[in-house]
Amino acid sequence: MLFRSLSTDLKDAVLTALKGKIDGGGAAGSVKIYTGTKPAGPAVAITSQVLLGTLVLSYPCGAVADGALTFSPITQDSSADATGTATWARIFDSAGVAKIDVDASVVGGPGFMQMNTTSVIINGPILINSCVITA
């Protein structure tokens, strides 16, 4: 996010609003992981990016503190839909409405979403180790 000069309490307010939108459907949201270039935003349609798999968020999805939304454990996808390199993910509410796109990387990499591996094999598991969105 681009809110680097905001106070921590204001960052927390922005992220609490995001968390509220993800949890707003009254049930668990989801994360869809894709290959390719991340679109300009969650309202932009998927084009050539390949859907690798879908994972289910916890409900509520996480907690906000100190300018970060830290997601609770995310249920793995036990059978990937396709083979490819995970580069980004789109997070949805329980009604399937896209809320935010985030970069993916291996643990220790620069992505908000950290995976044990970004190399996904069809029918293999997809695991998100952590997802922390900072403002």
Feature names for model-found ranges:
Residues 3-87, 93-135:
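Small cysteine-rich, disulfide-bonded extracellular modules of the LU/uPAR three-finger superfamily
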